[in-house]
């Protein structure tokens, strides 16, 4: 037991380096996923059926296929089309595209939950649809979308372990490499699991604090 604990301590710098890549992938995937997801949500809500259906097809594909398969298509498949990507950019693109599909549905549902009368009231005072969306609808919709978006972000942190399959040196990959050298399977994978758990716990705490702050602001106003 003492030797296993010492090994975990000695391996900490490598695991923390992997955790750094895990955080980078998570933050990048969430940021780009939100940006694309918002655009897709607007497409889903479009009055033009062709535009709406394009977004529907995108969401259906990325929600209906395994994330691991999507990563393999990007990293191993695209080179056959002349598009070669390094592991980290390939993983970031894969996570962003996947997150965009889920963010799209979360944001679409949140925007749709706002009463139609608010759009009509804004139009009656001369506001354009873009102004109404930015000033009136989005602030309310984001309060509704915050909990599921936070949960999706926590899930993304755990899903980044899949990047190990395309050689990204994130947390799980580092644990694999150390295990291959030391054969201490239980110790290293447990150490990696604890770091994932710490990251998820911190994010969950931050999410709860943010939700409490938003709710308190709503009550005060």
Locate each region found by the language model.
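Transmembrane alpha-helices and adjacent helix-loop boundaries
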Residues: 1-221
């Amino acid at each position: 037991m003492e030797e296993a604990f010492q090994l975990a301590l000695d391996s900490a710098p490598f695991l923390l380096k992997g955790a750094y890549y895990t955080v980078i992938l998570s933050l990048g995937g969430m940021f780009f996923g939100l940006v694309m997801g918002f655009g897709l949500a607007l497409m889903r809500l479009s009055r033009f059926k062709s535009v709406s259906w394009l977004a529907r097809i995108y969401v259906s594909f990325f929600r209906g296929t395994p994330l691991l398969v999507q990563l393999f298509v990007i990293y191993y498949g695209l080179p056959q089309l002349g598009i070669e990507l390094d592991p980290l950019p390939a993983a970031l693109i894969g996570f962003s595209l996947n997150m965009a599909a889920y963010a799209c549905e979360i944001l679409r549902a949140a925007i749709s939950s706002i009463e139609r009368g608010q759009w009509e009231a804004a139009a009656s005072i001369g506001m354009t649809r873009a102004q109404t969306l930015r000033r009136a609808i989005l602030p309310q919709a984001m309060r509704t979308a915050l909990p599921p978006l936070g949960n999706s972000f926590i899930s993304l942190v755990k899903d980044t372990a899949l990047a190990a399959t395309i050689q990204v040196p994130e947390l799980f990959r580092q644990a694999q490499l150390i295990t291959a050298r030391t054969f201490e399977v239980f110790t290293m994978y447990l150490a990696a699991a604890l770091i994932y758990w710490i990251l998820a716990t911190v994010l969950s705490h931050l999410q709860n604090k943010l939700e409490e702050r938003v709710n308190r602001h709503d009550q005060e106003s």
